[in-house]
Structures are given as C-alpha cells and as structure tokens.
Amino acid sequence: MTQNKFNLRPWMMLLLRSLLFFVFQGLIGLAVFSGGFSSLWEGAAAWWPITVILTDLICLGLLVSFYREEGERFWDIFRFDRQHLKQDLWTMLAFLVLLGPVGFLPNILSARWLFGDPQAAADLLIRPLPAWAAVLGLAFPFLQGLVEIPMYMLYVRPRLEKQGVQPWLAVALTGFFLSAQHVFIPFIPDPRFITYRLVMFQPFALLIAVVMRWRPRLMPYFGIVHVLMNLSVAVMFLLVMHI
C-alpha cells in the first residue's frame, strides 16, 4: 500500500463518535431536564438511542461527503459480491458461530464481575422513555448498521495504513475505539459502568476489525447482522416505555 502524507481526518474520526455522544447527551439533558448537574446528566442517560441517531446522521453525512471527495461512492460498500456469494455466506456462518462466545460472553461475564448480576447492568442501559422517543429509537439500529462498522473499518483503518501505520496497529486501534465508544452510550460517571462498557465489546470489536481487514466485501452481511443485533435492543425500549 502506497504511503500518503499525514492526514488528520482519520485520526479525528476515531474520536468523533465518542465526542458527539457526550455532547448530545449533555444537550438532551439541558433540553429535557431541570435541576442540578447530576440529575440532568443521569436523566439524559436514558435517552442514549436518540444520541446515537443524531451522531449517526452526522457521521453518515461526513462519510458520504468524504468518499465523494475521493472520487468514490459510499453506498458501494454495501454491494453484494455475487462472484463470491457462496463463499461469503459460509464465512458469515462461521462468524455467527463465533458470535455467541466472543460477542455475548464478555458482556455477561463482565457485568457479573462488576455488578454481581448482569440484570443490574441491563437496567442502567434500558430505561423507560416516552412512547414517541421509544418508537423513534427504532431508527438507531438501521443507522448503526449503515455507519458504525463502515466508519471504523472501511474508512478510518485503510487510511491509517496509507499513512504508514502498521496493519496490526491500525486493526488494534479501530477495534479498540469501536468498543471504547460504548463508554459514552450512555456516559454514566460510575467506574464500574465505565469499565463494563469499555470491555464488554472489546473481543468482538477486535474480531470484526480482523475479519473486515481480511475480507472487506463482507460489509453488507455485517450490516445486516449489526442491524438485527441492535434491533433487539431497540425493542427492549418499547417494552418498558411510558405509555
């Protein structure tokens, strides 16, 4: 891969989502809640699906624009490669087999280690919202499928490598920040919760980073799986919403 001159943009994109989550949580707190800072921030934490939607819309616009600047089309990354369709389906089947132990066990085990009961961590994440907000939250899984993995793995990672970053380090960085952004969705200033959100997706994020570097044409399949995973979370908000 030809090494290009230093470009700050991919480095900023590593941090952008975390920053936007934090800012939008604060703005929602100011708009919806009154009282002291602690109650404002705590109340806004329940609205994290909306912060994700707002963040994803900004990131989607940036990605479309950045790809266009480079003479490419962002939406092309979601095209299925029909020439390798059967091979890619078998690869995704193998990935789904790993999804259980790598994707879900760290979540459950870290919650049990830090909180004693995984349900305690879940209760901090899934809180009642007004019905309209819970319904609007159904948009976040689809936006996540369009933005999250493409941003880190197909935009940032290749451009870090073009600047001379070693492939293993580019994979490690994008995998780490893909996981670490969850500290801010929502951000709750509790060391246990911060640790939980930092580590719960780390093995899964690194697996995604490795697979996406090896076979980036799997992006449309990853997008579908990602939407379905997040859709199950969005449905939980419907089950606890204020009617």
Language-model segment annotations:
Residues 23, 27-31, 35, 65-66, ...:
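Hydrophobic membrane-targeting alpha-helices
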Residues 57, 101-102, 176, 231:
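Hydrophobic alpha-helical transmembrane segments of multipass integral membrane proteins
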Residues 26-29, 130-243:
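Transmembrane helix-loop-helix hairpins at the membrane interface
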Residues 1-80, 87, 113, 231-243:
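N-terminal, membrane-interfacial amphipathic/helix-forming hydrophobic leader that caps
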